[in-house]
Amino acid sequence: MKSLVLLLCLAQLWGCHSAPHGPGLIYRQPNCDDPETEEAALVAIDYINQNLPWGYKHTLNQIDEVKVWPQQPSGELFEIEIDTLETTCHVLDPTPVARCSVRQLKEHAVEGDCDFQLLKLDGKFSVVYAKCDSSPDSAEDVRKVCQDCPLLAPLNDTRVVHAAKAALAAFNAQNNGSNFQLEEISRAQLVPLPPSTYVEFTVSGTDCVAKEATEAAKCNLLAEKQYGFCKATLSEKLGGAEVAVTCMVFQTQPVSSQPQPEGANEAVPTPVVDPDAPPSPPLGAPGLPPAGSPPDSHVLLAAPPGHQLHRAHYDLRHTFMGVVSLGSPSGEVSHPRKTRTVVQPSVGAAAGPVVPPCPGRIRHFKV
């Protein structure tokens, strides 16, 4: 009887040993705070900020989950979920995101949620899939932190548009250089007491002289793009409105001749903005380049005609819609969600509670 049991055990062991292990059927789950995992997440953050045509740069807040799948014939595919936070740096601002301040809760913070797939080959990451969305913190949560702090206002609110135009006119009147045109209204808040409108917006330089320009329609954008970022407050007073505005003008950006994916010219609208209409976010930005490619100068996309949305921020989902990147090193990406086998990192026996590998640490605060 003992011999029969031993024979059955040996047969089972041999069956396990000889069973085929198909490529890509087993994934590993490293710790969300491992250096390699964080490196992948930071590449994803760079990808967001290099390709976001509107709004503000985002920074990494937390890594929620990571799975690593072997790829054939070589490399690994990192499937990662991350949380981001909006910073105070506009996407046109050349300041590295590591030096940008995170927008605080009392300022009505904005959180992003992203799913990425990154291929790692020869020690380098490249993005092959990106899907994101973002949303402002709830009014209730803002009120818990600051009862009287203003909330985000719709970007196409008539008071917001009026404040941006008045601030731009005041800036051009004080400017001895180029005349600037309104490019994008980025953020706004309506302050009840004292009654005022706070607005942040971007401008673009033209070939007209500021103090000589009388008709904006006759001014053309500079060949070497020059953008600026402005903050302004329009205060309502008994004697009339009072405008305070400060603008930071960035260095000129040379026109890039980088080749575009086939069909991209048909899909991307011409960068023309009507200064008399409040800008709106694009429906999407097709043909995004892979991460790691040279950071091209930003091109602000004109909103589709008649597309006016009643929103207070630019949602990441309009740019990162879950389309496989055209820059994927191979035409195929495995679909790992169909498999079930998982290999956990080895953990030695130790006293005390076991810390789960994910989610990772919160770098700033939870929204």
Curated annotation (Swiss-Prot):
Pfam families tied to this protein: Cystatin (PF00031)
Gene Ontology BP term (one): acute-phase response
Residue positions where Phosphoserine is found in the record: S134, S135, S138, S325, S328, S330
PTM (free text): Phosphorylated by FAM20C in the extracellular medium. O- and N-glycosylated. O-glycosylated with core 1 or possibly core 8 glycans. N-glycan at Asn-156: Hex5HexNAc4; N-glycan heterogeneity at Asn-176: Hex5HexNAc4 (major) and Hex6HexNAc5 (minor).
Region feature Disordered, mapped onto this chain: 255-298
Result, substituting R317H: In APMR1; uncertain significance
Compositional bias of kind Pro residues: 276-293
Intracellular or extracellular location(s): Secreted
Tissues/organs with expression: Synthesized in liver and selectively concentrated in bone matrix. Secreted in plasma. It is also found in dentin in much higher quantities than other plasma proteins.
Gene3D superfamilies, per the entry: 3.10.450.10
Record's GO cellular component terms: blood microparticle; collagen-containing extracellular matrix; endoplasmic reticulum lumen; extracellular exosome; extracellular matrix; extracellular region; extracellular space; Golgi apparatus
Modification Phosphothreonine occurs at: T319
Disorder named in the UniProt entry: Alopecia-intellectual disability syndrome 1: A rare autosomal recessive form of alopecia. APMR1 patients show loss of hair on the scalp, absence of eyebrows, eyelashes, axillary and pubic hair, and mild to severe intellectual disability.
Family the UniProt entry places it in: Belongs to the fetuin family.
Name of protein: Alpha-2-HS-glycoprotein
Source organism of this protein record: Homo sapiens (Human)
